[in-house]
Amino acid sequence: MMKHDIEKVLISEEEIQKKVKELGAELTSEYQDTFPLAIGVLKGALPFMADLIKHIDTYLEMDFMDVSSYGNSTVSSGEVKIIKDLDTSVEGRDILIIEDIIDSGLTLSYLVELFRYRKAKSIKIVTLLDKPSGRKADIKADFVGFEVPDAFVVGYGLDYAERYRNLPYIGVLKPAVYES
């Protein structure tokens, strides 16, 4: 059972849903008179994005990118790879990047530069989790759900080797799981 691999629950399902609702209200206000392109960063942001968009009461378009700087490792390789690109042009659009966690910041820094190059009108970032202690790139989210400590967190989209994404909460993974 997955729960035996979790050292502790860091953020409960109830806390997540409350924060998602608050972020949705902020984003409704931010994008009230626009038609933003909400870009979910796969795979991790999928549960967060699915819940978040239900609370954004304005028109928006959705698309997804799959990019990675981790592979199956716990440490960013520093090299960002596009696995799935957008189907939609960002040129002249207000872009909202929806991310599960900002750790090294390398992936988001790459995406922001890519969308600038592709001539996006504006770029904002919403992340469920922010881990400033892991930062290697100078990047900040415009909207943050929770700040998390320097621990390996999983659940609600976040994984280790493609496992634990389906936990309904954010938990700290026992080191024995990823150190073996």
Curated annotation (Swiss-Prot):
What Gene Ontology terms describe what this protein does at the molecular function level? Answer: guanine phosphoribosyltransferase activity; hypoxanthine phosphoribosyltransferase activity; magnesium ion binding; nucleotide binding
What the entry lists under InterPro entries is as follows: HGPRT, Hxn_phspho_trans, PRibTrfase_dom, PRTase-like
The biological processes this protein is annotated with in GO are: GMP salvage; guanine salvage; hypoxanthine metabolic process; IMP salvage; purine ribonucleoside salvage
**Transmembrane segments annotated in the record for this chain:** none
Which positions bind GMP?
131, 152-153, 159
Active site as annotated? 103
Q: Name one Pfam family in it.
A: Pribosyltran
Listed pathway(s): Purine metabolism; IMP biosynthesis via salvage pathway; IMP from hypoxanthine: step 1/1; Purine metabolism; GMP biosynthesis via salvage pathway; GMP from guanine: step 1/1
Main EC class the enzyme belongs to: transferase
CDD domains, sorted: PRTases_typeI
- Where is diphosphate bound in this sequence? 43-44, 165
Reactions the enzyme catalyzes: IMP + diphosphate = hypoxanthine + 5-phospho-alpha-D-ribose 1-diphosphate; GMP + diphosphate = guanine + 5-phospho-alpha-D-ribose 1-diphosphate
Q: What is its main location?
A: cytoplasm
List the keywords (alphabetical). Cytoplasm, Glycosyltransferase, Magnesium, Metal-binding, Nucleotide-binding, Purine salvage, Transferase
From what superkingdom does this record's organism come?
A: Bacteria
Protein's UniProt keywords contain Cell division:
no
- Provide the binding site for Mg(2+): 99-100
Keyword check for Glycosyltransferase = yes
List the record's Gene Ontology CC terms alphabetically: cytosol
Cofactor(s) for this UniProt protein: Mg(2+)
User: EC number(s) for this protein?
Assistant: 2.4.2.8
Sum up the protein's function in the record's words: Purine salvage pathway enzyme that catalyzes the transfer of the ribosyl-5-phosphate group from 5-phospho-alpha-D-ribose 1-diphosphate (PRPP) to the N9 position of the 6-oxopurines hypoxanthine and guanine to form the corresponding ribonucleotides IMP (inosine 5'-monophosphate) and GMP (guanosine 5'-monophosphate), with the release of PPi.
**Family to which the UniProt record says this protein belongs:** Belongs to the purine/pyrimidine phosphoribosyltransferase family.
Please give the name of this protein: Hypoxanthine-guanine phosphoribosyltransferase
| Organismal lineage | Bacteria, Bacillati, Bacillota, Bacilli, Bacillales
